[in-house]
């Protein structure tokens, strides 16, 4: 949903410009990922590319853009490129604010669903969350940090793990909406 929302925003802007949005799904796990992206850009003769997470984090892809002379913007949790080529999200701040909110509500035992370690957003959200908890003197035990992969299915699976935690958490912080929806279904 995150990327779809970005696409809707881009479409709103492009309607006034005469440019079109071309969406090309990428499989970062593929051995031919970089070559496939290069070929697509060359064949389509793209004016510019907006790289969304997690492909935006791949420096090899940014290098291909520079080699081809293709304008690009990277959306990521931290600055990975020149300022004019970056949109930096506030993942750490969002995690911190979520922790503060839950702490103000009186929660001290909070389960945290994180995304893949390879995703910078997952690291930033967790770091911010832990910083927010620390402001209230709350620690995050390792057994309350559950590894997912930003999918509904992983949230569903982690929901059953949450039910096995003893003592049970009084709140859950999911690192993205898909895992949150999955854990909500599992806990209901």
Regions found by a protein language model. Give the residues of each.
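Intrinsically disordered, low-complexity polar regions and short flexible loop motifs
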Residues: 49
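Bacterial carbohydrate/catabolite-sensing allosteric modules
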Residues: 5-23, 42-45, 59-60, 66-188
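A short, glycine/small-residue-rich beta-strand->loop->alpha-helix junction that serves as a flexible
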Residues: 2
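Glycine-rich, highly charged phosphate/nucleotide-binding loops
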Residues: 30-36, 96
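Short beta->alpha connector loops
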Residues: 27-31, 52-57, 178
């Amino acid at each position: 949903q995150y990327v779809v929302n970005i696409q809707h925003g881009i479409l709103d802007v492009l309607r006034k410009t005469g440019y079109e949005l071309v969406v090309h799904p990428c499989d970062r796990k593929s051995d031919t990922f970089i070559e496939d992206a290069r070929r697509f850009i060359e064949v389509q003769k793209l004016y510019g590319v907006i790289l969304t997470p997690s492909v935006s984090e791949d420096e090899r892809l940014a290098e291909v853009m520079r080699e081809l002379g293709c304008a690009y913007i990277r959306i990521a949790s931290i600055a990975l490129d020149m300022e004019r080529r970056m949109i930096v999200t506030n993942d750490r701040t969002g995690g911190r604010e979520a922790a503060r909110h839950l702490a103000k509500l009186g929660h001290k035992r909070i389960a945290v669903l994180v995304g893949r370690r390879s995703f910078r957003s997952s690291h930033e959200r967790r770091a911010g969350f832990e910083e927010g908890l620390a402001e209230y003197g709350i620690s995050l035990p390792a057994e309350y940090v559950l590894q997912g992969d930003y999918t509904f299915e992983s949230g569903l699976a982690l929901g059953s793990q949450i039910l096995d935690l003893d003592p049970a958490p009084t709140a859950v912080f999911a690192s993205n909406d898909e895992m949150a929806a999955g854990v909500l279904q599992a806990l209901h």
